[in-house]
Amino acid sequence: MVSMNSEIWKPAPFSPSFTDREIGPFFEMRMYTFEPEQIDKILGPWEQKLEARNNLAPLVGAFISEIGDVNKFMHIWGYKSLQHRTEAREKFSSIGWPPKSDAKPPLKMENKIVMAANFSPIK
C-alpha cells in the first residue's frame, strides 16, 4: 500500500435522514475543501434555499468532514436520469443556487456521478 486516507463525516444540520427512498438511480456527489472556519458560513444560506433546490432534485444528504481531511463539505443529490440533472442545472440561477454567503470560495472541488449499490436503502 502506498497511501491510505480515512475520513469521518457528520450530517449537516439540514441533512435528511437516510430512509428508503427511490430518488435515483443517478446521484451527484460534490465535495468542497474550504479554508478553516468557512463551512459554518454556508450552512444558513444553504438551509434557506434548500426547499427550492429540492424541488429540482432531492437532497440525499449533506455532510461535514470531522476526522481525516477536515474543512470539507459534501452534498449528494438524486436524479432520475442524466437529462434530469441537466434540466435541473439549467434552472439553478432562477432559484439563486448556489446560495450566496460570506464564506471564501472553496479551495478545491470534486464531483462524481455515481449509482446506488444494490443494498442501499436509497435508490
What are these regions (language model features)?
Residues E66:
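Conserved beta-strand-loop-alpha-helix junction that forms the acyl-donor binding cleft
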Residues S17, E35-E37, Q83:
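A short, structured loop/turn motif at beta-sheet edges
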Residues T33-L43:
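Short, surface-exposed ligand-recognition loops at beta-strand->loop->(often short) alpha-helix junctions
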Residues M1-M31:
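Surface-exposed beta-loop interaction hotspot
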Residues M1-W9, P45-V60, D69, G78-A117:
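An amphipathic, aromatic/His-enriched active-site/gating alpha helix that lines ligand/cofactor pockets
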Residues P16-I23, M115-K123:
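Short, low-order "capping/linker" segments at domain edges
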